[in-house]
Amino acid sequence: LNKRNMKKLIVIMSEFGAEFLPKNKFNFPLKLISTEMPIGINYKAGVSAQLKSAVILAGLNSFGSTKIIEDEKSRDHTENMLIKNFKTIKIKRGKKKIIEIFGKKYLNSININVPGDPSSAAFFTALTLLNKNSSLKIKNVGLNSTRVGFFQLLKKHGANIKFKNIRKDNNEIYGDIYVTSGKIKPLKASSKYYTKATDEYPILFIIAALTQ
């Protein structure tokens, strides 16, 4: 992480009033100097859910409102959790998704159920699909619509994958994944899977290499 370029994050947090030292350095370690008067901003989101979540959390601690305008759908765990439990956030859905955060509000503590990671489940799913006469049940996996592109793509190409015992908690859908080995057609992924299967592309490449 120390080698990762944080320029986008630094620029955004600077708009809230934060200061980073030394200046013109965009990777960690950095010294962060907070401000006593953080002011909400308007932010046009890209596909990075991490940057969007950073803006949401910074907006919670800023005066006034912070607006996030989202043209492309990205992972939405943070806003799902907040809108379910607090009145500090509003979401308008249309051609563009607009998230508005009202900062400096008191937040009550809550209990959160965190389901299993679908990206981790993808590796065990691949192992089962590629081994003859194999079956697997993975319990309590997050099935958020922005996270299941890997499974949707494989099902489209013949993989025997089923979601069962589906339920909802804190605005998050989760359930059990049932996998049975079998023949998979050659994979072809359109651009709509880009954000929904970003982390799973390496294992998809392996599956594609081993299918007939």
Range-by-range predicted roles:
Residues L1-Q212:
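Structural preference for solvent-exposed beta-strand-turn elements
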